[in-house]
């Protein structure tokens, strides 16, 4: 959403989140260069965020102040995206133990803003360094040999997810047609788990 008084292309702020119970978190230096774009209510240029000025990989996540999320089972995301060049939008989760993961689901080659939906149960995950926003070994190196250089995180616990969001692992190309992502609304569907408890309820 666009808070009152915000005009033009400016870095996103907490006020761009429609739900006052949800915090936005930035990962990677380039995340602070993610800009607002478009006009609320416009059919031709709807309000969204745009990554063209992000000069490195970044991730943006959202955190409910009151609850964690159980995204196992039927947990899913519906978001509105547009991409340019070889850029893709990928899901990101931060688990209860602080581990950050980026998924292999990738929305690419979306020339106009369009709704995309996917289930977390269909996603494979790789560990993400939250500072550099790059993929890293998931910790299996201490165990048996990892065939084919695979670094997938095996059976991550998605029953208590602290934050959920998106990532673009490529630097943007700047203004004009080139390489970037647009992202409008983000809706997450799962079970709310009140912080400090282990009881899930429908959300």
What spans do the regions from the language model cover?
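Beta-rich carbohydrate-recognition modules and glycan-binding surfaces
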Residues: 1-203
